[in-house]
């Protein structure tokens, strides 16, 4: 039978930092009131990285907000001072997380090893200050480059959950109710095409931090004969193999007409039939529905488990909440011990992230020119290239008219104006600035 995977899915938006703008400044010193350009460059925007961290078991910590931003860079300053780069944003995810582009479904990365990382959004390149644009024909450039915008992306994170705790027991013993009491979140679970039976998972947090969160799974389908393939027992038993703790949930009230001790032995038998290693896992015996027992009956149940099984039983009530906190901490104590045995733990604060090239402002490949005519008989020049050019150098056309006209004329502006019917003395507009056409 097909093996079932528990898939946790989280969708988030990430935005890298914008590059800082280059500065337009000039030296202002004693005896040099009108010195040359000294504008510094803008810094580069921060990047967004995802890194696989062995201390995490779930994606729950990334559900607290939907949007994540790296820091924008600072602008350049006078005296050729460059702006500070924006801080990178590093998001930690569990080992085994698959990163996808939400819109296309394309896999960006499979973070299947501790410390493995990927860049999901590049920061913008900082703009150059006016110092870079001094030339023999322009000793005092009054323009500089604009910083590029950082990348933004909608990504989907998928994690094949490895449940830390498996709740096993007969149907109707209250496993789902226990999960609803102890857990803070319900992961978004993938659909199973061959069954309407959906595994019930919960994320438990001890003190609200990702490092103290763990996954609890209700393993359904466990009935007598499960190890022989009855129901879906053997499929879900495969998942229990990966748990750190097995919690036997038993109905101590006897409301289903079964004996609690016999229930325990039946489930243990199924585990041993399926896998000897599985039967050796750390276990907790939990007696649910204890609120239906009298104090005398509670003492009798405890004594009987100690005498006949040799282990104590933790009595709880998923209805009243009695013993729930004690159960959470008992599970966490065992999980902590198992996590100490993990190998390959990496200090992600010491990782030196390799960065791809930042996003740069790029001008269109060609100079496009479109001529329109308004109601006054004036000609309007439209050009995406010129718009991009002015954005790149954060200047209004009136301050760069000579440069703009030079670019346009080299690409056939005069011929296009004549073809559109322009004559000597007509008014022509380019990005809000007018000039007189001369043949």
From Swiss-Prot:
Its cofactor is Mg(2+). The keyword ATP-binding does not apply. Keywords: Cytoplasm, GTP-binding, Hydrolase, Magnesium, Metal-binding, Nucleotide-binding. The keyword GTP-binding applies. GO terms for biological process: ribosome biogenesis. GTP binds at residues 169-176, 194-198, 218-221, 288-291, 317-319. Mg(2+) binds at residues 176, 196. Pfam families: DUF1967, GTP1_OBG, MMR_HSR1. Residues 4-162 form the Obg domain. Its EC number is 3.6.5.-. GO terms for cellular component: cytoplasm. An essential GTPase which binds GTP, GDP and possibly (p)ppGpp with moderate affinity, with high nucleotide exchange rates and a fairly low GTP hydrolysis rate. Plays a role in control of the cell cycle, stress response, ribosome biogenesis and in those bacteria that undergo differentiation, in morphogenesis control. Monomer. This is GTPase Obg. It comes from Fervidobacterium nodosum (strain ATCC 35602 / DSM 5306 / Rt17-B1).
